Amino acid sequence: MASGANVTDNKQQTPQESDTLKRVWAYLKPEKRNFVLAIIAMGLVAASEGIIPKVVNDLLDKGFGGSYAGKLWHVPALLVGVALVRGLAQFASGYLLSQISNGVLLKMRMQMFDRMLHAPALFFHRNTAASLINAVIFEVNQVMQILTGVLITLVRDSLTVVALLIYLFYTNWKLTLVVAVLLPAIGFVMSKVNRRLRRLNREHQALTNTAAYVVEESVGGFKVVKLHGGEAYEMSRFEAMAERLRGYSMRMAVAGGLNQPVTAFLASLALSVILTIAMIQAQGNQTTIGGFTGFVMAMLLLISPLKHLADLNQPLQRGLTAAEMIFGLIDEPIEPQNGGLPLERARGDLVFDNVGFRYGDAARAALNHVSLRAAPGEVVALVGPSGSGKTTLVNLVPRFFDPTEGHILLDGQPIDRFALADLRRQIAFVSQDVVLFNDTVAANVAYGVHPREKIDMARVERALAAAYLTDVVKGLPEGLETNIGDNGMKLSGGQRQRLAIARAIYKDAPILILDEATSALDSESERQVQAALESLMVGRTTLVIAHRLSTIENADRIVVLEQGRVAEQGSHAELIGKNGLYAGLHRIQFASQA
């Protein structure tokens, strides 16, 4: 049973919280000016909190029959002014922080996508499409939303707490010390809950990716699901994942929910102690009615920001967990570039010299001591039973993987001496698994043209003509500018295959790799595609993987692979005459067609 993979490697050591926060801060540093302005704005909001109890204090002590009685109109004017400044400051801080977070979001998302594009092939074997889409599109957005919310609460409410504490010390320092004693107790409780919450968040995220992969499999394979009556099985799979997610969510709710009631209890305890001390002070004329009322009001105003700060723990841990995933992708090593030897256009002399390859920790090597040569312009067919190493061998040519033994030479030079981009410019690839993009016909044919360069439309038309697609394209609503839909869904199977061939023709690379390019087509489509392939192969070194042996009988040479080794090679006639593995495969295939 396949399961979703996380974009971070679980075997790696978990980053420390401080390390993750430092990395997030590194993205915020270029926005230091806006950040400082936002803090100033939030400072004004916090200062406004401390003004209110001071006004109440003076009003009670001086306003009612006291020296302040004739100036009571100042109070509403002051409150209106405070509200106006507070509102403007809140808007300014929100706008500035949104500008910062959206800038960081753009930078992170671009870095993630760039790293994903340049990751080695093994990375895509290790991670599912669902987990990568989740990371690039959703997780990075969640990180910025959560961390921005956390940042606003942390700065604004911390400043509010500071402003109110200053007022409290100014009003009655003895009572304030009681509050100060209880604050570390709140911090201690938060630190205890913190570690468990972070672990639960990390496990919840990994499970979310697995659930997304189940959905991806069900959607991508809907035909198989329906034909085989797999709805109940898929439902049970998804239900199991959903139940586990619910369990983790409840455990997180329990762990996170402890913060608020404990904080509220400690705050109530503090208030009870303060009331007791205040009553003792009142008996000794150490406080006034206004002073005590202002102090209690400031205390009550202090509870809300303290509660907000206590509740920060759960979203902060969720944001840090998602940030770890994002940084795991950003830190993913790119493909090894190796040498920088330039390569304009190769002759196409391709040599496999004692090549071996093993996938990771696999028990058996996929290739063993493979030696063969494809001369410039030669068509070499690779045949053999499933699992014999045909696809692995051709995947080594564009360096999707590097051999674990031996060397591959192009025009006499090991391919890892060439600049990777230059090497891949020499290779065109047409597979049975056609990949087309949700774009126009022209953009698909000229795929890989730099965005700043203009597509050569005349060259596109020539490529389409060589692929026998001119009439098809003329029949489309907007011709070359017609959008072909997701993976070319607006075209038939044969048309999609020929469009992939047109893309290879447009590229005009000296080396061509054909991987079962006609295996999934009907007879008429195969005839058209085969004709297009024949025009494509002219003058190019071609490696052809084929199960249907009738399609490669005219190859210059046929190489038969068995269990990762070259079993035999020669022309079709020579191999039939040897009466070996190829002749046996040929007999079986043609007997089944008779």
Swiss-Prot record:
Q: What is its main location?
A: membrane
Where is this gene product found?
Cell inner membrane
Transmembrane stretches, by residue range?
A: 35-55, 64-84, 135-155, 161-181, 262-282, 289-309
Cite the entry's keywords alphabetically: ATP-binding, Cell inner membrane, Cell membrane, Lipid transport, Membrane, Nucleotide-binding, Translocase, Transmembrane, Transmembrane helix, Transport
| Record's bilayer topology term | Multi-pass membrane protein
Q: What positions does the domain ABC transmembrane type-1 occupy?
A: 36-318
Known catalysed reaction(s)?
ATP + H2O + lipid A-core oligosaccharideSide 1 = ADP + phosphate + lipid A-core oligosaccharideSide 2
**Listed CDD domains:** ABC_6TM_MsbA_like
Q: What is known of its domains?
A: In MsbA the ATP-binding domain (NBD) and the transmembrane domain (TMD) are fused.
Function statement: Involved in lipopolysaccharide (LPS) biosynthesis. Translocates lipid A-core from the inner to the outer leaflet of the inner membrane. Transmembrane domains (TMD) form a pore in the inner membrane and the ATP-binding domain (NBD) is responsible for energy generation.
The name under which this protein is listed is ATP-dependent lipid A-core flippase
